[in-house]
Structures are given as structure tokens and as C-alpha cells.
Regions:
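Short glycine/proline- and charge-enriched loop/turn segments
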Residues: 129-133, 137, 198-204
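Left-handed beta-helix
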Residues: 72, 77-78, 83-84, 91-92, ...
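A generic secondary-structure micro-motif detector
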Residues: 48-49, 133, 151
Length: 205
């Protein structure tokens, strides 16, 4: 290739120099959130984590004290982690397994009877990599009722998992999953429908 045909490299975007913008880059969270987050981290690392294995009601109470909306008879394992309790909502009989991580920089909703298995990761935040400042982007995650997030699966920001859907172990989900579908792989793809046996007829009165 001759010198005349050599493409000109693009001019790089200059780095952020404005001090206010740089400060926002370091942390965009309100001061009140930082204080609550600090208090919660102390509670989570002590009263929450070192509670008895069967004390889900106790852990539910601690989450509620920090603003979470927790339904009835939820099972929350002591080794699970929640980043911002006040951005978490769980329906009745929902389950969060051992070492599951709810990195809820944005709101996370877990529906009735939904299961988030061990070491699953719900990540409601990312960064805009098209800008050198890498500003934070938060998007809600919704896990529908009767859905199952299997072990070590990743669910990204802005994703809705439909009612009754199943996310296979170690799957990476960056797009919505329709109700009653089973997805697996990286990136997650639909592998089949989830078919349930018909409900028994109601008893005769």
C-alpha cells in the first residue's frame, strides 16, 4: 500500500478534564445512598451473613429495614449478596440461593415463586464504553413469576425474564426471554419450550 492510500487514524476523543464530570465518573450515587450503602454493608457482613441457615425471615426483615419489598415466606440464603436493598422487590415464596449476587444498581424485581439459584449474578448496571469517561448506565431487571435462574447464570441490565422461563446454568442473558421458554448458552438462545402438566380440576363443591 502506498503512503497516499494509507488511511488516516481517527482523532481520539480527548479525556475528561472538567472536575465536576470527573467527580461524577468516580461516583454518581447520592450521598444519602452512600451512607445507607455503608450501613447496609456492615449489616450484611455481620447480622445477615452470620445468621443461622434457616433464618430467612430474619434476613427478610433486615432487607425490609433498608427499604426492600419482600413478600411472604421468601427463602434468602445467608451467603447471598444484595447491593442496594431499597432497589429490590421480591414476591411471595421467591428464592435467592447461596452466593447469588444481586448487583442492583437499578431496580431488580423477582416475581412470586421465582428462583435465583446459587452463584447466579443479576447485574443491573453497565458502562457506556463509547465514551472515555465510561458513564454508568443502570437498567431494571425483572424476573417473572415461576421463572428459574439456574446456577451461575448471568442476567444483564434491562433484561426481562418472562413468567415461567428457565435460564440454564452458566447462561449469559443480555436480551429479554419470553414466558415459558428455556434458554441456555453464551449468548443465551431458546432451546425449547417449558411445558408444565395441567393443573388438577378444582374439587367438586
Amino acid at each position: 500500500m502506498t503512503e497516499a492510500n494509507t488511511p488516516t487514524p481517527p482523532t481520539p476523543t480527548p479525556p475528561v478534564t472538567n472536575s465536576a464530570a470527573a467527580a461524577r465518573l468516580i461516583s454518581s450515587a447520592p450521598t444519602s445512598w452512600k451512607i445507607r450503602r455503608l450501613l447496609w454493608s456492615m449489616v450484611q457482613s455481620t447480622l445477615y451473613r452470620y445468621s443461622f441457615h434457616t433464618w430467612s425471615n430474619w434476613r427478610s426483615t433486615l432487607l425490609r429495614l433498608f427499604g426492600a419489598k419482600i413478600g411472604k415466606q421468601c427463602s434468602i440464603r445467608r451467603t447471598s449478596r444484595v447491593y442496594y436493598p431499597w432497589l429490590l422487590e421480591m414476591g411471595d415464596l421467591a428464592i435467592v440461593g447461596d452466593r447469588a449476587e444481586i448487583y442492583n444498581l437499578g431496580p431488580v424485581t423477582i416475581g412470586d415463586r421465582a428462583m435465583v439459584s446459587q452463584e447466579a449474578y443479576l447485574c443491573a448496571g453497565t458502562h457506556d464504553y463509547t465514551q472515555l469517561a465510561m458513564p454508568l448506565i443502570t437498567r431494571p431487571i425483572i424476573i417473572g413469576s415461576d421463572a428459574w435462574i439456574c446456577a451461575r447464570a448471568f442476567v444483564g441490565p434491562g433484561v426481562t425474564i418472562g413468567n415461567g422461563a428457565v435460564v440454564g446454568a452458566c447462561a449469559v442473558v443480555t436480551k429479554d426471554v419470553a414466558p415459558w421458554k428455556i434458554v441456555a448458552g453464551n449468548p443465551a438462545q431458546v432451546v425449547k419450550d417449558r411445558k408444565m402438566p395441567p393443573l388438577p380440576p378444582p374439587p367438586l363443591s
